[in-house]
Amino acid sequence: IWDDGRKLFKENIRMKGLIAKKVGMTQVFDESGNLIPVTVIRIDPNTVIATRTKERNGYDAVVLGIDDAKESRVTKAYKNQFAENIAPKRTLKEFRDFEKEVNVGDQIGMELFDGIRFLDVTSTSKGKGFQGVMKRWGFHGGRASHGSKFHREAGGTGQSTTPGHTFKNIKMPGRMGSKKVTIQNLQVVKTDADLKVIMVRGAVPGNKDCTLIVKSAVKK
């Protein structure tokens, strides 16, 4: 019953999504005079590269692309997936169960999100390099007083005589960041069709000018 219900739910839900770029953060005032930190997201027109259908591929999806690439810089195999009238794109993304009916070559802009108040944004977080447990996991650390030799270390990880070894998945120093992160339910504060930007409340993962995947919020 659970599998059937979950499958039925997935078949009924339709998504809206586009490829975008992160411009940076700023702040705006609302009607009450409150200061709101916002992230500016630029959504240039996305080109429909290909479509997937249940009859041909077993599922419904749309492949979108942005940023033209030099034809001399792409391989023949990569170029062959584009129609003759479409220039090769640097960034491609497949969106399953796309809500809007589209054809290859169509241009989809930020008007797709008209009337939507909350968005989910996915990107790769900033890489922090190899970090200790205090920065990576928020450990308290040791005393900073005189005579202490335990300041920013993780402490004992092997426990006592039993079990006498370190378990898997223990929080330890390591490489931090540079992971795929999704921030859900970001409120749309302001839109500007002329500048092709959407301002959402709060922060978005990634550095400036990074590629974002913007979708309509699943949980709203």
Where are the language model's segments positioned?
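Extended basic (Lys/Arg/His-rich) segments that typically form rRNA-contacting surfaces
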Residues: 9-220
